[in-house]
């Protein structure tokens, strides 16, 4: 947090991840709930210069919207706020920590994290679990993803979390780019035209 204070200015825009909300990383169990997140939210909100739940900034006529999806789901208040952003009528790039999974992104993630011999065993989509299962079973999140797939103003999604770099068509109007961590020297320049 000291580095955020020192190096990130007021113009920063971002979507925090599970590492920011985890107070002790692997030294205590993470509950993946809003209550668990709330334990760290006040401290984080004082350091990061943007609304942690949902923040929007227009840059060169494009509405960059960051959305807290740290545990794979979204909440009703975030859906309402996103819809209000869409009513502005500007092209939208949605930035999240956890991607909104497609079958292809889920498959790529599971193959990456599989034991080496299992990686090339099958082209089948692995059974949903974790964040992917939450996105399929949580009604608010599932409905929001269905809405996003039909939102013509959505032009791109930028995400991380998986520690792999992959991209896939999310909807007729939007590509989703998932980029691995900087600690792996991953990065991707995305140009929107």
How should each PLM-predicted stretch be described?
Residues 1-91, 115-121, 150-153, 167-192:
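Extended active-site neighborhood of metal-dependent phosphoesterases/phosphodiesterases
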Residues 17-18, 97, 160-161:
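Active-site glycine-centered loops adjacent to acidic/histidine catalytic or metal-binding residues
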């Amino acid at each position: 947090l000291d580095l955020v204070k020192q190096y990130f200015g007021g113009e920063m825009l971002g979507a925090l991840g599970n590492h920011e909300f985890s107070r002790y990383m692997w030294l205590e169990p993470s509950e993946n709930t809003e209550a668990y997140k709330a334990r760290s939210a006040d401290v984080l909100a004082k350091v990061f210069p943007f609304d942690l739940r949902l923040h929007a900034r227009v840059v060169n006529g494009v509405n960059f919207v960051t959305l807290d999806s740290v545990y794979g789901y979204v909440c009703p208040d975030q859906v309402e706020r996103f819809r209000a952003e869409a009513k502005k009528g500007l092209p939208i790039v949605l930035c999240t920590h956890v991607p909104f999974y497609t079958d292809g992104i889920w498959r790529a993630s599971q193959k990456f994290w599989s034991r080496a011999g299992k990686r090339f065993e099958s082209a089948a989509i692995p059974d949903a679990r974790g964040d992917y299962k939450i996105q399929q079973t949580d009604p608010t999140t599932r409905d929001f993803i269905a809405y996003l797939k039909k939102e013509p103003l959505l032009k791109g999604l930028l995400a991380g979390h998986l520690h792999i770099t992959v991209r896939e068509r999310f909807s007729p109007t939007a590509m989703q780019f998932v980029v691995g961590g900087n600690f792996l020297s991953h990065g991707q320049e995305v140009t929107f035209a």
